[in-house]
Amino acid sequence: MTPLAPWDPKYEAKAGPRPVWGANCSSGASFSGRTLCHPSFWPLYEAASGRGLRPVAPATGHWNGQQAPPDAGFPVVCCEDVFLSDPLLPRGQRVPLYLSKAPQQMMGSLKLLPPPPIMSARVLPRPSPSRGPSTAWLSGPELIALTGLLQMSQGEPRPSSSAVGPPDHTSDPPSPCGSPSSSQGADLSLPQTPDTHCP
């Protein structure tokens, strides 16, 4: 039976001694059920286990597949064991973190080099004071439409294309009910009858 990877939902950690660096990286060992043992947390794991911090394995030379000394105390970690999680991915899927060095060489600095972010904050360039405020984001028709919308929301009368001035409220003809009609809010295109507009 093939051992399950630590990120597999069916993976269960076995109680017992923790494995150390060895030739077989596919053992899937972890400190807890499905928690990744990130190299930056190794000192914490060592302290929590009551054994105290052990000196870091020497970073000189390359790991040649032989088992580390029994007192090294580092868990088995492969490149596949180092990943980032994404809450938008389906459960159990991970984003692999490609290491710049083999995991064994990463122990010396206890730092990982994560990939560059997909989205990063970028400050928009500030307009130069000599040019004034920039309106390059909107085209001419967009500016006209936006100006019209702002005027409508503030209740200002719309400029008409003809040369007719604003409506004169004093010269409105009296309504059939005897009171002066208001040109604001009334639809002049509909015929007014005494049945529908009188109180």
Curated annotation (Swiss-Prot):
GO cellular component: cytoplasm; nucleus
Primary residence: nucleus
InterPro entries reported for this sequence: SAP25
Gene Ontology biological process: regulation of DNA-templated transcription
Keyword DNA damage: no
Biased composition (Polar residues): 151-163, 184-199
Region described as Disordered: spans on this chain: 151-199
Keyword terms, alphabetized: Cytoplasm, Nucleus, Repressor, Transcription, Transcription regulation
Keyword Repressor: yes
Cellular localization per UniProt: Nucleus; Cytoplasm
Oligomeric and partner information: May be a component of the mSIN3A corepressor complex. Interacts with SIN3A. Interacts with HDAC2.
Summary of the function given for this chain in its UniProt record: Involved in the transcriptional repression mediated by the mSIN3A but not the N-CoR corepressor complex.
Protein known as: Histone deacetylase complex subunit SAP25
